[in-house]
């Protein structure tokens, strides 16, 4: 098959390398930065440069750019896409993308499926892309139609051929609701946590807890700002819930209320055990 990869950063670049390493498919790649596209070709990450003249030859089109850019790309190229092609985006929010792209696909006769590979690094760019980034990872899919079992089986088989160990099928709204907690809130908290005045003198005083909590503080502010704003309703709910929870801990400590503090700590510990086991 011919696989197009649009956007050759960490996610897209790793997809192209995974396809090259794990399959015999040909990769047609494109990045808005022409030098990255050329480097990926010289590096062996892609076979050909994706363009208007060959996009119709692609069986799968994997789009790995920001949400708004995903919609713009699909609007611009929709008439050139093969009617039998499957287009999958890799954005971190799904409702904003799927609401537009389902309609674009329907009008132009191809299939669009929302996607979100649950893997990444705290670095960005093609130079950090690796063929094994997705080994053992989960891929979330948000199709417009879950009745086409044959198509979902084919897409799942293709995705797993790249190293993913599991595929989760859900709706765009459910994805956004849960991802606000599991990913977006974690990035907000991590990024805010390192703004403590003590952060600059942490060396020699920090170990696993500090590393765990600050791992995702270093981020791409342009991408994450867009993701947060596109999912603001769900993210604000999670932020408010966290603020309320922190207020309970703060109040117990301020009032020297050890019993309440112990209860809060035990509740959190028990909650962790119940959701992980």
Per-segment meaning from a language model:
Residues 1-52, 60:
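NAD(P)+-binding Rossmann beta1-loop-alpha1 motif at the extreme N-terminus of oxidoreductases
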């Amino acid at each position: 098959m011919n696989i197009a990869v649009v956007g050759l950063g960490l996610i897209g670049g790793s997809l192209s390398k995974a396809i090259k390493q794990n399959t015999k498919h040909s990769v047609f790649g494109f990045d808005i930065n022409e030098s990255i596209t050329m480097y990926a070709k010289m590096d062996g990450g892609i076979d050909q440069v994706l363009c208007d003249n060959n996009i119709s030859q692609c069986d799968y089109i994997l789009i790995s750019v920001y949400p708004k850019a995903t919609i713009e790309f699909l609007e611009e190229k929709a008439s050139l896409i093969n009617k039998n092609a499957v287009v999958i985006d890799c954005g971190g929010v799904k409702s904003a993308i799927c609401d537009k792209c389902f309609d674009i696909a329907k009008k132009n006769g191809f299939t669009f499926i929302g996607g979100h590979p649950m893997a990444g690094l705290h670095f960005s760019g093609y130079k950090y892309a690796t063929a094994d980034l997705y080994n053992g990872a989960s891929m979330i899919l948000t199709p417009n139609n879950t009745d086409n079992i044959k198509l979902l089986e084919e897409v799942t088989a293709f995705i797993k051929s790249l190293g993913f160990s599991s595929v989760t099928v859900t709706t765009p709204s459910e994805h956004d609701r849960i991802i606000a907690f599991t990913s977006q809130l974690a990035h907000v908290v991590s990024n805010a946590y390192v703004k403590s005045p003590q952060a600059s003198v942490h060396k020699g005083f920090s170990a696993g807890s500090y590393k765990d909590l600050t791992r995702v503080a270093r981020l791409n502010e342009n991408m994450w700002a867009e993701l947060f704003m596109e999912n603001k309703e769900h993210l604000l709910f999670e932020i408010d819930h966290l603020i309320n929870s922190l207020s309970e801990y703060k109040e117990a400590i301020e009032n020297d209320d050890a019993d309440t503090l112990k209860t809060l700590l035990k509740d959190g510990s028990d909650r962790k055990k119940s959701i992980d086991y």
